């Protein structure tokens, strides 16, 4: 028992890529640090760093990187809506993405034999391919009991997104760094509150001294 929920392997790959594209390509805060998307003309490297695996090194133009950056902005809206409990809005955005990218199911040969269900776009271009795959992965997550697992970090001002793979849906932060920052802030607030608490005028016996009690 690992204490984690395991997504279907294909769903996990595409939703994980969706999450990392949002965090790499959209503006906001990473922890307390303000972040901006890579400037136009320098996005291909950032997108490639997200997509690359040992067996997959895509060629990518700046135009394609710009299109995937625009996709990341819309995927952020899905995470934000799902995290706030507005699953209907998240579903509406995903439905639009499914239609736009022409996501269609297809059985592809698997490495170990047999076949694996994948989703393809209307053509084999990298933008339509990943757009369709991400839209389908998000659709399968939102259309199941995984809907509540698309989250936005709650360590203000951080707004990086994450996928909650815990069994108890207990994840609230994008990283241990943000979790530690919030815990430290709570501890400081409690300590400050204790220091400000008025001292009791009771004596060691728990009763007021005679002169104070008689003055009441």
Q: Residues of each region from the PLM?
A:
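Cysteine-rich micro-motifs
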Residues: 168-179
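Feature targets compositionally biased, intrinsically disordered low-complexity regions
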Residues: 169, 192, 202-205
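Short metal-binding segments enriched for Cys and/or His
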Residues: 182-192
């Amino acid at each position: 028992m690992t204490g984690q929920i395991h997504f279907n392997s294909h769903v996990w790959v595409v939703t994980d890529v969706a999450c990392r594209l949002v965090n790499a390509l959209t503006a906001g805060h990473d922890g307390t640090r303000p972040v901006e998307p890579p400037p136009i003309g320098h996005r291909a490297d950032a997108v490639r760093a997200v997509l690359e695996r040992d067996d997959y090194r895509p060629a990518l133009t700046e135009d394609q990187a710009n299109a995937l950056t625009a996709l990341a902005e819309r995927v952020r809206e899905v995470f934000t809506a799902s995290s706030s409990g507005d699953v209907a809005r998240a579903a509406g955005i995903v439905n639009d993405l499914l239609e736009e990218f022409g996501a269609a199911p297809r059985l592809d040969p698997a490495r170990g034999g047999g076949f694996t269900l994948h989703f393809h776009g209307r053509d084999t271009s990298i933008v339509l391919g990943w757009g369709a795959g991400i839209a389908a992965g998000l659709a399968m997550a939102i259309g199941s009991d995984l809907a509540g697992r698309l989250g936005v970090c709650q360590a203000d001002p951080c707004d990086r997104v994450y996928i909650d793979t815990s069994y108890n849906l207990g994840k609230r932060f994008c990283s241990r760094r943000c979790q530690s920052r919030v815990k430290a802030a709570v501890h400081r607030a409690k300590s400050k509150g204790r220091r400000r608490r008025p001292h009791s005028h009771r004596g060691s016996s728990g009763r007021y001294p005679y002169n104070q009690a008689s003055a009441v």
